[in-house]
Amino acid sequence: MAQTIDPHLQLPPHQDFAALRDEAVGFLTALDGQPWTDFNPSEPGLTLLETALTGLVDLGYRLDHDIADLLAPAAADEAWQALPDGAAALSCEPVSQHDLALALADQPALSAASLAAAPEPGAIDVWLTPRRALDDREKLAARQAAWRRFHRQRPLGLRPGRIMVRDKASLYLFPELELSAAAPAEETLAALILLWRQALQAPPVYQSAAACLAAGQSGDTVYDGPLLEQGVRQDGPAADGQALASRLIDLALGLPGVARVDSLQFSAAPAKETLSDRSDGVWSWTAPDNSYLLLESEELINWWSGAAMLKGQNFDPLHRDGQRLRVDAARLRALLAAQAAADAAAPALPPAFGRYRRLSDFPAFSPALPAQFGLSGPSPGASAQEKAGLSQLQAYLLPLEQLQANQAAQLENIRQLLELPRGDWLATLSALLAKMQASESLSRADIDAFWRAAAALPPSTLRQPVSPLPLAEDLLAADDLAAYRAAGAETALETPLSERWLDRTLRRLRHLLARFGESLPDAAQLRYRGVFGHYAAQLLASGSALPIPADALPARLAALKQALDLAGFLLDFPRLSAARGSGADIAASLHSRSGLEWRLARRLGIPLEHSPLSLGNREGLYLVEGALLPRRDGSAPPAEEAGRLYWILPSYGCRFGNDAFRRLVEQAICEETPLHLQAMVCWLDGAALNQFERLYRHWRAKWLELGGPAAPSVPGEADWRADGAPQSRRARLWDCSQMLADALAASAIIPPFDPERWLSHIGRDEIGGSFTLGYADVPVLRPATPDGKIGDASRPYVIAVSAPLPLND
């Protein structure tokens, strides 16, 4: 169908050619005594004005493209998003107990999860409510899934206590119904079962994010809390475990197709075990404690189809116009199954890809002028005076054309201004600067790699040539024409790693970060210049170095490191923001980190790696939660200690050895630590940090044994309350945790310990021997022995660690 333009369409000012033309002409004709006072519609200047306005309106039109189009990449098949989508930017890991309950209940077999404070400080007991009857295998699977999800999305300072599944309390209903004459029996009864099930069991309702947004819900509401796999859970009343006959009868009578409810009998047993008594006076039924009410809809189907009868039954359960009625049980089951399948929902919106608009394409408007202007080329018989006039006109138009061409080129830069940073240079430069932070020496290959990455920094096109340029040879001298074309054809006006590039990049990244309400300390507070000043001469000595003054390179390296920090924070913003209150998944990996660790490290430019810090001068940190330090007898830590977060950092290093920087770290820790938890900061020297890392590695391994591949078949309460045999996983965890808790409480003085007693014996019954879980112990730092030999146990081979470089501010 053909589309027409709305005659009442109101264009924005930057797209309204007629309004712009009238305004410009009115301004010119109002100039008393100036040219164009006697306005003539055939004035050639008016044509030039209209042509220039056409270019301006074209730029305005391009600016009004959808944001997705402005950010679309040039490659049509490039599956890349410029900014995080709503699901990533607005959702978060569980923060409140309500959030955690929603995440734990996000299983198809579960209706809800409720949390209760356990007797031990820092522990949370979980009750799981199924949607339907579960066998023992399904209950175990639900508990294990909840236990793993609790660890994966665990809030700081909490650990799972007992994880229990409520038992079902079956409710059998035996209603006597009169259906309306025109009501389809199976459809009416299927709708009635769904109504009663909703009232008695309150099953969760999930909708897709697209459906919620289409219904008028805001993005903040749709993506509030954790992102669930089943979709967006809708608020609704919770099941109270009670059935009231009056309520069920009202629901039935409100359904089209049900004419009358003659009786309604409750029972906790199926029909064959229930005595028929329509006048027993039971009008309510309550589920026992720690159980959930389950409507046995299959028995209802059998009851209405005649496959089930009460003891002593002498009436028909279903009739129409006084006549006995039987339903098709297979069709009724199919209708219920189809409704269950229709309840499935998608968790998030599909990504929206924009259309690449080639914003930098700007055709020069000189060739589009009428032929009488002569800019397409002078006639063969033109005089020198006529050619000079044409060249003068072209010279007048060239600045305007160049200006609009540059504006079109800068429109192409919108994507670079608004998109997240990307490219191989991020990882390459970050790794090399991390080596400098660790006071490590740079190899020739490292230096060459640095300059290659610096030369590949993403440029910005700030101007482009006017093409085509008529009469260019007549307008400019040969040398000037070559210089203009060379300068106009450049893709970037900035030297890589120049002050202008760094300043613009930092402003752009800070602006993007501010849109998320975030800001990072500046380079002066982070003391980067004092670190990189040691490497300026070595970097500039390379043959591939860029032409940068020696005294300017440390400041530019500091600005580059801050740009990398901002870029890394933006790229990881969904995780750094959503998981800022989440603990480490200690049951899944030896090296998993809490969201708070990642966030603090990103803020301060601290690289986080898996290798031990005590074997060099690398920067890093550790976080130990007091709630995860059970005592040697298996008891939980006291409430005061359970609410502590222990931060362990090296007291040496180029930056960490500086008092001002350590104060900045402690200030950031205080700002980022949740208010309900107490931060304890431990600064350790090399020897103490080495002892801590050895102890920490064993402690993490004990947690991994408890919840990893060797996890018990029934996780949760059994892991904490079963008898701790000498070689049990629980006993080793308790013993190791007690040692770590004592060390952290004793002003971070790590005493000697014997890790042999913590070695795993989880395979003793299977292979008759002991083995470790698969983690390497942290090497012990010992005094160097000049005459030692490799392999000599009494004189171990030691790698000497050089002293860290001092800050060179």
Q: Which stretches of residues belong to each language-model region?
A:
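Single conserved position on a long alpha-helix in the C-terminal lobe of the eukaryotic protein kinase
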Residues: 33, 39-42, 46-75, 84
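Hydrophobic/aromatic interaction determinants used to assemble and anchor large protein complexes
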Residues: 1, 703-707, 739, 760-763, ...
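Extended, charge-rich low-complexity interaction segments
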Residues: 705-753
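Carbohydrate-recognition loop of C-type lectin domains
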Residues: 2-47, 93-230, 293-702, 732-741, ...
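A short, surface-exposed helix-loop junction/capping segment
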Residues: 64-88, 220-235, 644-650
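Membrane-proximal bilayer-interacting regions
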Residues: 204-285
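Solvent-exposed, conformationally flexible loop/turn segments
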Residues: 277-292, 296-299
